[in-house]
């Protein structure tokens, strides 16, 4: 849907899946025409992730089940807008720092990708929201919150 609606569709990097698996999925879903837009490097090391996040126009993370979602925070902290699921623990972690969508609604996902692609002001706002959100998960903030808990316990 996104590829059909976009005048200049963004390429898609798919991490941790082999190209053969992706090709099989494309064939099964009868969408092989988008194969040239996909890049599947396989496993990506942690050392390479910041460069990939920084080079991305958006980070799409539509997991159906997630207990925390560290990649969301990694991407946001690199200044990459995030489109993610409105399910499981993701909304609690993402807060207003990411665009929440139904992970099964391809129209909603495509719509948000198009909006990020075509509306630079919206994209910059999402970057700002994401950077602000990550401050809540910094080591500094976590240590301050833990100190407050300890102080409240010792005062009792």
Annotated model-derived regions:
Residues 1-9, 28-32:
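Short hydrophobic signal-anchor/transmembrane segments that target glycosyltransferases
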Residues 64:
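Aromatic "clamp/platform" in nucleotide-sugar-dependent glycosyltransferases that forms part
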Residues 44, 51-56, 61, 109:
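Short alpha-helical donor nucleotide-sugar binding micro-motif in glycosyltransferases
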Residues 108, 122-136, 145-148, 152:
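A short, well-ordered alpha-helix in the C-terminal region of glycosyltransferases
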Residues 72, 77, 81-84:
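Short hydrophobic beta-strand element within catalytic cores of glycosyltransferases
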Residues 14-16, 24-50:
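Nucleotide-activated donor-binding/catalytic signature segment of Leloir-type glycosyltransferases, i.e.
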């Amino acid at each position: 849907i996104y590829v059909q609606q976009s005048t200049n569709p963004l390429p898609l990097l798919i991490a941790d899946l082999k190209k053969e698996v992706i090709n099989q999925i494309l064939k099964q879903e009868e969408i092989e025409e988008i194969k040239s837009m996909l890049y599947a490097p396989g496993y990506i090391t942690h050392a390479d992730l910041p460069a990939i996040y920084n080079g991305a126009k958006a980070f799409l993370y539509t997991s159906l089940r997630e207990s925390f979602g560290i990649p969301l925070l990694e991407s946001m902290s690199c200044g990459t807008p995030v489109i993610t699921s409105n399910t499981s623990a993701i909304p609690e972690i993402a807060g207003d720092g990411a665009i929440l969508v139904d992970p099964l609604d391809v129209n909603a996902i495509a719509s948000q990708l198009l909006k990020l692609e075509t509306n630079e002001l919206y994209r910059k706002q999402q970057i700002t929201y994401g950077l602000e959100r990550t401050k809540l998960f910094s080591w500094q903030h976590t240590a301050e919150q833990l100190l407050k808990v300890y102080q409240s316990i010792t005062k009792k």
